[in-house]
Amino acid sequence: MDYEQLVKTIDSLPPLSDSAMLIQKLYDEGAENVDIIKLVRIIESDALLAANILKMINAPFYGFSNKIASVAQAVSLFGTYTVYGLVTNYAMQEKIQAQTSSYNITSMQFNEMCQMQSHLMMQWYSKIDLRHAQFLAPLALIMEAGKLVLANEVAQSENSAAFKQGVSKSSNIQHFEYDFFGTTSYYVSGLLFEHWNLEPLYVKMLKNLDIEEEDIGSKMEYYIDTLDVVRTAVNVNNILTEKSIAEASLIVQDMNLDHFHFEKVANRIKAPFEKKRKQ
């Protein structure tokens, strides 16, 4: 399970679905310039894609009192940036049948974790910079995709038990992944995005999140720090626990941002999650 084998695995993955590729083309000129009518029409033409998007946006922690029943309503409420993330998330998971048990979580728990990362990014960072929050929230939703590749590699190896045990004991999943594979799941996500010709800035951020590959400048480093905040607060071992929120809050302070606001948002998102878990 070396790095070269991972690259070969990614290179062998088939293209995304026709619907996903058509939607990607709509975003070529930027999410703010997307033709909403065409976007809704393409999503509605793919019954499974439409159903998956509606399922995700009706998640309890979004807090809608009434069920969102149409794609048009979903796009109107969430905007084109979030819809991009939802479409890409579904399209990638179509091509990577994940064995998330390698990370000691179920597929449902993995999806909930990704949604919570995106929701936290949007709710926290929108007060700081709404436009960039809209750009970063979809990335937060799909940045864990590399774990699906690594999990499948582990499941097919003789090291499954050792990997699961290592994940459960690890205080830093990225360090553990690097020791195991010579790379991290976020860098693998960058390779996946590159393979499928997704947003180039997403590729750059993911590839430099754990492994400084190039001089990316202070602005890009700042946005990478926002991803670090979110993945520290919400990850496979800790989903908005008291400890993970506190650790993420320290990063927020290092960014010279209001950590009290971050903690308030994190705990607000945590409440419905905790309620559901206890049911």
Give each language-model segment a name.
Residues 1-5, 244-279:
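Terminal helices and disordered tails flanking the catalytic cores of nucleotide-processing hydrolases
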Residues 78-79, 114, 144, 170-177, ...:
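Short, mixed-charge aromatic SLiMs
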Residues 73, 160-188, 257-259:
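Divalent-cation-assisted or electrostatically stabilized phosphate/pyrophosphate-binding catalytic cores
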